[in-house]
Amino acid sequence: MDPRYGAQPQQHPHPHRTPSPGQPLQQGYQLDDNPFDDGRYGQYGPSQQHLAMPSGPDQHRLPTPSDHLNLNAAQSVDNLSGYGPPGDYAVNPEAHHDAYYNQPYEPRPQQQPYDQGYDQEYDQPYDDHRPMLQHQPSDAPSEPYQDQPQQGGGIKRWKTVKQVLLYRGNLVLDCPVPPVLLQQNPHGERDEFTHMRYSAATCDPNDFYDHDFTLRQRLFTKPRHTELFIVVTMYNEDDILFARTMTGVFKNIEYMCNRPNSKTWGKDAWKKIVVCVVSDGRSKINPRTKALLAGMGVYQEGIAKQQVNGKDVTAHIYEYTTQTHLQIKNDVVQLVHRRQPVQMLFCLKEKNAKKINSHRWFFTAFGRVLDPNICVLLDAGTRPGGSSIYHLWKAFDLEPMCGGACGEIKAMLGTGGKYLLNPLVAAQNFEYKMSNILDKPLESAFGFISVLPGAFSAYRYVALQNDKNGKGPLEKYFLGETLHGGSDAGLFESNMYLAEDRILCFELVTKRNCHWILQYVKSATGETDVPDTVTELVLQRRRWLNGSFFAAIYAIVHFLDFLRSDHTFLRKFAFFIEFIFNTINMIFAWFAIGNFFLVFKILTTSLGDDTLLGRTGEILGVVFTWLYGVFLITCFVLSLGNRPAGSGRLYTAMCWFWAIIMIYLLFAAIFIAVKAIIADVNDANGFNFADIFKNKVFYMLIISVMSTFGIWLIASLIMLDPWHMATSLVQYMLLTPTFTNVLNVYAFCNTHDVSWGTKGDDKVEKLPSVNTKDGTGKTDLPDEGDLNAQYQRELAVFAQKHVEVKTTPTPSQLQEKQMDYYRGVRTGVVLIWMVSNFGLAALVLSSAGLDRISPNKDKDHEAEQLSRSNIYMSIVLWSVAGLSAFKFIGAMWFLVVRMFRGV
């Protein structure tokens, strides 16, 4: 933390944050009333008067002394001495047009108490129920507010030139929200509802605080403590995806505000929550999404600037406390007014710099100013459950050592599960479910989750901080931004940081002299849409597989880093067991393509035995073997030279072929096992039911496979979530060869591609600039009529259902950057992978002679081959069953702990 934090003499009975939110302060805060007061956040003198704004119909909100917010706008220099009577605004809004803008708030070097410049009555303790100002009833007689103010002085709209004051070169404007929006929501004279605050950041995120930028929460008479800091990162998501996420966030905030008996939450819980939306590139944001933000009052067109005093603006920051929520009806987003207030922070980055840069703005720029307790990460399109964010927070509240947590990611299945009709969606649904039933609970039981998904996870802010030497989790996390920004980086590191969230988890748990753990919170759910076409799935899994594979290698190689942590010996031993388990899984993942071919070859060849299919089985075995080779080679050729988007039909055809292969393999396994049982039944020595389990073929094929399925079913039933076994198991089984062959082949053949797939043209419309002399400059700002007209235009953008318009790709999007070095290393990785897998197949099929499985026990010369075949098949199939059993044990322990923990 910055050494200037906490420099103010201690005036609070609890001058420091408690070690854990599990022991909340009596006042309900985990932080001082003024933890950052070093004089940088002084208040204005008594000459600053407040601008009275028209109250909303029928009701208004009463501000409290602690909620007093200084007007923080760029005012006309002609009105610096003060404003006219506040009440005149309601009579003629145009007459006080300039009064919207007053001196921009900026920190002062000297230290000042919070009550400076106010009446002496504020020296007494804060009373949230005592109004700061004498409010007039909203239904008091007054002239109705006019949406179309009178034209004044021949000034052209959108060309209202204002002189603004800058402090140390920072442009900060407090802009009035459109009157038509203001009339829809209750408000008083508190300008967090009546004004939108714009800051033009001209610095790197790491320098945001040092360059004297601040945020609204620090400007109140009693700075608001941020308990929950929620970030929604987006690129070019449309209004439906954005509204889906924001709807879930708003429901969570309402849920926390409706917990009157909570020590932390309650009626004013929204004051402790800040929702940050970071959009990756001004040229990339979806126009409908931008219009939606404008409809909420968070964004205004025509305010942003390109440069300030010759310095390029890196991010446009809009702050507003909105009372306008969203709802989706018939694929159209609608605004819902008069809802729970939500503190919004919208950061529109000037250039596209990828998601990791968006997180750097969130953590290092805004997080340093607000110093939140818990940070929640969401992707636009992920919809959290109605109380999921609360349950994530509760996990930190109950466990002081919890440094990070994640919930259950669900596949979006549509109304009545209609998306399950798509086999790809059903297969991914099964994947997600089993991961949340077996994998995540196992890792949570050990205390180390290999990846907290960036789409829906949470971290304790203090746990992420670097040490005094600048080393720590965030330092390692943001290293990936420079690696992908053009600096010299090896292929290993570049691919590893495709899964930068895995690196963050590892560095958090192994943090020096700390003992943070990671937890899975089953009661917290997040719903996301999954790829519904083969090409989208291939592109998504390329980054997932490569990133997770190289990150797993990084974790295994750096396992000794756990020794630098402050974990107990028992916890470190548990980590050791978990890493052995992860190493075994990684070995199986490396040899997955070889193992699948061996199982295929052994089963199909065995069907050619005279006691099985005979000549028909031999012919089918040869045909399927040739087709297997052709389609596998096709996978390599497509992966090495073609874009999936241009080869969609071929990839779809391969999915169908591998599904047919899987059907044939399932038939072979069942048919061979049944024939083996029949042979035992017809044995001349008589039949005993126990002999079935002594039959090696039945024991190897049926028991091992069914034990895996049985574990899946039992675990799903115990978790009270078994429906995917009925709706998605068959699709998952049929697409398993596609996951093994198509996705793995494409991922390894494209290890040279270290992009997120979001590169593009950064050309964007130029914005006006501001140049100042002696801290004073001129800029164009809209008047009230402009605000209303602009607001209506923004509403019209998303009023109708979106119609997809096909656009011609730009030349820059069609060109591929030449990466000879990466492609050379890619070739080496693919060759090693292919040779090792083919070597395994050759060893088993040629050297060991394990090319047949036959239930016929009369041929003595095949006894040795059968024995060795059983050995190999037993190792493969029972290893799968054993790994599933290990996950099952971990999941059961997770349930036992969860019964006592409560979340």
Curated annotation (Swiss-Prot):
GO terms for molecular function: chitin synthase activity. The chain crosses the membrane at residues 444-464, 543-563, 573-593, 619-639, 654-674, 700-720, 729-749, 828-848, 875-895. Residues 67-79, 135-150 have a biased composition (Polar residues). CDD domains: Chitin_synth_C. It catalyses: [(1->4)-N-acetyl-beta-D-glucosaminyl](n) + UDP-N-acetyl-alpha-D-glucosamine = [(1->4)-N-acetyl-beta-D-glucosaminyl](n+1) + UDP + H(+). InterPro entries: Chitin_synth, Chitin_synth_fun, Chitin_synth_N. Glycans are attached at residue 79. It comes from the Eukaryota. Keywords: Cell membrane, Cell wall biogenesis/degradation, Glycoprotein, Glycosyltransferase, Membrane, Transferase, Transmembrane, Transmembrane helix. It is found in: Cell membrane. GO terms for cellular component: cell septum; chitosome; plasma membrane. It is an enzyme of class 2 (transferase). Its EC number is 2.4.1.16. Disruption phenotype: Reduces the chitin content by about 10%. Leads to increased hyphal hydrophobicity and compartments containing up to four nuclei. It is a multi-pass membrane protein. Pfam families: Chitin_synth_1, Chitin_synth_1N. GO terms for biological process: ascospore wall assembly; chitin biosynthetic process; septum digestion after cytokinesis. Polymerizes chitin, a structural polymer of the cell wall and septum, by transferring the sugar moiety of UDP-GlcNAc to the non-reducing end of the growing chitin polymer. Plays an important role in nuclear sorting or distribution. Belongs to the chitin synthase family. Class I subfamily. This is Chitin synthase 1. The gene is chs1.
